[in-house]
Amino acid sequence: MRKLVYLAAFAALLVALQAGRGGSATVTTADSATQRQADLYQIDQIEVKFHRATSRHDIDLMMSIWAPGAVFNIDQQTLTGKAQIRHWFLTENKAFMPTHHWESDTPSYKIKIALNGDKATMYFECHYIDPKTGMVVAAAGVTHTLQKINGQWLITNSAGSTATLSP
């Protein structure tokens, strides 16, 4: 009986607190800031997955960050849809070549993210390092347009570019 009284009192307290906030429809500045930080973290994970996928030759991980109808402009080609993008990574991307065992890295200070609601842009560089020599063997830049689709941030459009190896 005592547990039931405590439970009822706790429920009443929650209702009172929620009513004092104006209900769940009210979004506070703290809520907005927290959501923004969560979105920025999730967007940053796209770069992490991108580089993990190239280092490990994990095509499924790579494709998990692309939207179904994504467009990728790379090497004077326009690839449309996950099938064409997947094919390019498997057949033309040097980091995915079976004979290359490169580590893929990005200088964190070169990552640029602009967030606007459920859309964002992100730029990062890919520095491919031969672990045997410690030398950068290839570098590229990429600008992604991202969208939050069904609660998940995905690449909808991307364009490859040359990277600047200086700060």
Show the residue positions of the predicted features.
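Surface-exposed, charged secondary-structure patches
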Residues: 71, 87-135
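Short beta-strand edge/turn micro-motifs at domain boundaries
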Residues: 23-31, 139-167
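Sec/Tat-exported extracytoplasmic proteins
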Residues: 47-50, 54, 58, 66-70, ...
